[in-house]
Amino acid sequence: MMIKTGLMAAAFVLLAGCTAPSQNTATDICKADNQMQQTTLYFGLNRPAGAQITGNEWQQFVDQDVTPRFRDGLTVFDARGQWLGNNGQVAREPSKALMLSHGKDAQSETNIEALRGIYKSRFAQESVMRVDQPVCVQF
């Protein structure tokens, strides 16, 4: 019992000097004026009922809805979504990932949410996943 107590005390002493690594944010590590926000949106290409969203339909969405809101540019990736459904079956869906680098401002937020809403409505989608993170950008 005394050995066990001694070992625990030694472990506490050793661990007392340990600290969790600090989480550096983009503000901490970015050079002046190059901090931005990066938002990646994930768009499924399967309709709940009917044909898959075509390449032409996707490109029309990008050209007419995305680009006018993000004139400085964007990047599109082909992606494949996968998840385990409530029925225990693996579901897979071809997808598109849209990466936007933008300021952290109200207009960008409005534009991003508009894109999500337009896509869900136009293509009968349940959701458009959104992932945000601070980034350092240089051109």
For the regions a language model picked out, list residue spans one by one.
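C-terminal motif of bacterial Sec signal peptides marking the signal peptidase cleavage site
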Residues: 14-17
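Mature extracytoplasmic domains of secretory-pathway proteins
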Residues: 57-95, 101-106
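Terminal, regulation- and interaction-focused segments at domain boundaries
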Residues: 36-55
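Helix-rich interaction surfaces within compact, conserved domain-sized segments
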Residues: 90-139
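Glycine-rich, aromatic-bearing surface loops/beta-hairpins
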Residues: 24-36
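Bacterial N-terminal signal peptides that target proteins for export
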Residues: 1-7
